[in-house]
Structure formats: structure tokens, C-alpha cells
Amino acid sequence: MGRKEMMVRDVPKMVFLISISFLLVSFINCKVMSKALYNRPWRGLVLSKIGKYKLDQLKLEILRQLETTISTKYNVSKQPVKNLTMNMTEFPQYYILAGPIQNYSITYLWFDFYSTQLRKPAKYVYSQYNHTAKTITFRPPPCGTVPSMTCLSEMLNVSKRNDTGEQGCGNFTTFNPMFFNVPRWNTKLYVGPTKVNVDSQTIYFLGLTALLLRYAQRNCTHSFYLVNAMSRNLFRVPKYINGTKLKNTMRKLKRKQAPVKEQFEKKAKKTQSTTTPYFSYTTSAALNVTTNVTYSITTAARRVSTSTIAYRPDSSFMKSIMATQLRDLATWVYTTLRYRQNPFCEPSRNRTAVSEFMKNTHVLIRNETPYTIYGTLDMSSLYYNETMFVENKTASDSNKTTPTSPSMGFQRTFIDPLWDYLDSLLFLDEIRNFSLRSPTYVNLTPPEHRRAVNLSTLNSLWWWLQ
């Protein structure tokens, strides 16, 4: 009987504890909901089902006004009748910047319209946010999702206009990511639903460039937004990059690309000094023969790498370059991806004909402002004047000015990364010619490619004089 009385007395306490727990849980949930509400791109009160339905219908109506048909060529799109402007009291949270954030003027960006509200894939619209008027202007049509070739093409079109507020970076230098001494292989990348045929050197270059230019924005806060936006179509670059790890990685790669030290030279000299030629005591002619033989043996035993063959009298090929030069070269390489996809790479294409990729890339050799499918690009930062020794005037470059002497002349030439890129095109052309001849000639040996020594070496490219 006493136990029942105690249980009856404990009932109010249990009810009290349960009610307190319920209030505490509801309070925590309210805080979580308010925090989630604060992070929404369209902020406001918690809507009912009817309110959410009306908001979704409003978004879909705006998207319907933005949608237009995009033609098959990426640089030509059907222009809408007008842009769409709406109020937005705060800067959006889901975006890809096309230029620096300018708090007292206009910021250019690709706005993620769907965000997380409609639970659909991101759909980016090129927009302008006015910080003074607190409005956002959509400039249709939307390019679609990222990654995709349509968004990459729109980013290249915007970079051609150069009206997003990007500025130069002065004399800021960075590492050279155009490696020449790398294994060569081809693969297919999915840029959204599109397959793109890419070689290994292009992947290494664009991937390392994305890291270097993202890190360079710490010093150049008004630069490299467009090329970093392009990189999001191929790579997932972290927002924050460890500078120490990046520098150590690039230095290791740089040492591997540098000329190989003559490790066998001392050993060869020691062997030569201890070895007594068999005919050294007879005649001078025999002495010359044995000396030549000994020299040829030491030369064969010494390792000769492709990186030891230079076209510059420098001790290292991987010198630092200007960050703006790296940006311009990366922009050019992104334009070439258009010609590495279908229908230009169909299996049923004529393999003996000139590829569209070669037709597009050859214009950079003779023209500093080449015309591309996205318009004219200014690549003048990739060239410079150099005084070079000219042995034969008729075979020299036609772009040189009047020489100061019969053996010297000024010549317009390329910076090191562009030279290595053109040399890789020569290597690809050699592989292409070998693959075309191998079915006919069974015992052909693969070509051994060495880096181009001078401009005359690149003349073997069929499109050099086009």
C-alpha cells in the first residue's frame, strides 16, 4: 500500500520532467529551424504548404522567362527580349564569381538559381548584383549546370569581353606548370554530359594552373576570377589551399623537370683514366683510334635525357612565369577543348584529313591575337622579342626585323610554356603519322621525340606555314 502511494506521489514529478524535456527539445528545434531559415537564399518566415507552393511557382515563372533556346554552336545564342531585374536585399549565397566583389558598385557572377530550395541540380544564370540599389539583374539564357560545355563556353565568351572588373596582377610570378617530360596518354573526360578527348599534358597543365591561380588570388584579389570559374568545369578545386604543400609539390616537380646532372661523368672519367689503351704505345694513328673508341664508350654509358637538350642556354627549363601569362595561356587551352569533343572526334571521321583541333591551334603560332570560335583573344603576353643567331636568312623567320649584322637578327618568339605546348603538338603529330603508317609497315619502331631545339625544328609541322 505504501509503494502505491509513493508511485502516485511521483506521477506529477514525472509529468513535470517530461514537459521540461519537451520544451527543451522544441526550443532546440526552433533554433535549428531559425538558423536554417537564415541560410536560405530567399529569407522570410516559415511558409505554409500553400506559401511554399506559391514561392516555387514564382521561381518557376522567373525561370520560364529566362529560358531561351541555345543554338548548336556555343558562341551563338538566341538573345531574349529583355533582362530581368528583381529586388534582393542581401548578396546571394550560392554563386560563381565572374569578377571581384565590389561593395559600392556592381558585382558580376553566375547565380545558382535553383540553390537548395527546389531540390534540383544547380542552374547558373549570368547576373549582375547592384550593391547600391540592392537588386540583381539576370542576363539570360542560363548556361545550365557546372560542369558543362555550355557554361564553359559562356565563361570564355565573358572573358573575351573583359568587362567584369578584373584587373592585372602586376609583376607577380608563379610556377610554370607546363611540364614536357611527362608520360603521354589520352583519355576521355566528362564535362557534364559531354565527352572530351584530352591528353595527359593538358590535364596536368590545367589542373596545376587551377591550383596556382586559386592560390595567387591571395596576393591578387582582383584577378583570375574567370579562369578559376572555367576550372570548375573540369576540377574540384578547394576554396582554401595550403601554400606550403603547394610550393613543396611544385618544387619537387620542378626538380624532376630540370636537366639531369651528369651522374655517370665522374665514374666514366675514372674508368677512362685507369684503362690503358691496347695500341697506345705504337703509333699516333692507333692512339687516335683508341681515344675515339674510349670516348664513344663513355658517351654511350652516360645517360642522356630529353630534358638535357635545350633550346635556351639556361641551366633550368622550369623558370617562373608571370601569373597573367599563365592566365592567358590557360584561357587559350580551354578554347581548344571545343575541338576535342564530338562531333569532331567521331570514330567514323576521316582520320587522314586535317583535324579541326589542328586547324584551330596553328593560328597561335603566327598571330598574337588569334580568332577562335569564341571571338578574338589577346595572347600578346605570350610573345617577346629575342636576338637570335641567324645562319641562313632565307630560312629564318619572316617576322624578324632588319638584322643589325649579317649573323644576328630580332625575332618574335614564345615564352617557355607556350614553346613546350607547341612542341607537344609536334609530338602528337609524330604519333599521328606513326599510327597511320604502322598498319602498312609492321616492323616500324615508334618515334623518339626530343624537344625542339629552335624554330626551324618546328617547321616540320605541316601547318607551320599555313
Curated annotation (Swiss-Prot):
Keyword hit for Membrane: yes
Listed name of the protein: Glycoprotein O
InterPro entries reported in the protein's UniProt record: Herpes_UL74
Record-annotated disulphide pairs: none
Predominant place of localization: virion
Function: Plays a role in viral entry into host cells. Forms a trimeric complex at the surface of the viral envelope together with gH and gL. This complex is required for entry in host fibroblasts. Mechanistically, engages host receptor(s) including PDGFRA to mediate infection.
Membrane spanning residue stretches: none
Signal peptide (from-to): 1-30
